[in-house]
Amino acid sequence: MASAGMYEEAAELLRQTDKASLPTHLMPDYYNACHKLYTELSFYTLDDSFKKHYQALATHYDDSLMQVLLPSSSLYLERREAREAAAGHPDEALSINDTRLAHAKPNTPEYALVTYQRSLLYRRLGNREEEKRYLALSALTDIRLSITDHASLWNLAELLYEEGDMEHAYRYIRFSWDETNRYNARSRSLQTAGILSLIDLTYQPCARSRMTGSGCTSGSSAL
């Protein structure tokens, strides 16, 4: 629910959950759900005091999560990778991602997630080509599996826009926007709206220029 922007509903469900009665094997799921909720809330709130409050709660639940996870579990590796990246150690994070990627089967939700997170690491390292490569792999997997969270695709669209490839940038962001609205993913609608407007404002004059024969800048595409 939190991933779809249904924060109030997600928070209410977690409030109704009696943590003390949960079996041990469900504790990682509980703490992970809490961590994701407050991470999303901290990202979207416009109030600085609430942002700090949500960030503190997200950190608290992340610490609790790490205490109940097996070090060999995929979620433990994912959280370790995120912590290394946040601490400014992208090379260490990439090494952990190497392990995760080696165990992620293509055309699975795990593969889509691991390749997306790998693209973020390459962004930190300033390796734009590898960032685009793994965004493309993640986006293709999302589409094949009908996953409606298109973070990979609209990030790729933004990169292509910055490189002047308006045709593909517009095509990808429009597809992402249409899918987001179809499934009423409110948080993604907010994220996509800004870059869609920016690309649209550039693309429409570009399209008119092509119609008059004056052409338009277009680069190579990752997809």
Report each predicted region and the residues it spans.
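A "functional boundary" signal
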Residues: 1-212
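Selective detector of the "anchor" transmembrane alpha-helix that sits immediately C-terminal
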Residues: 217-223
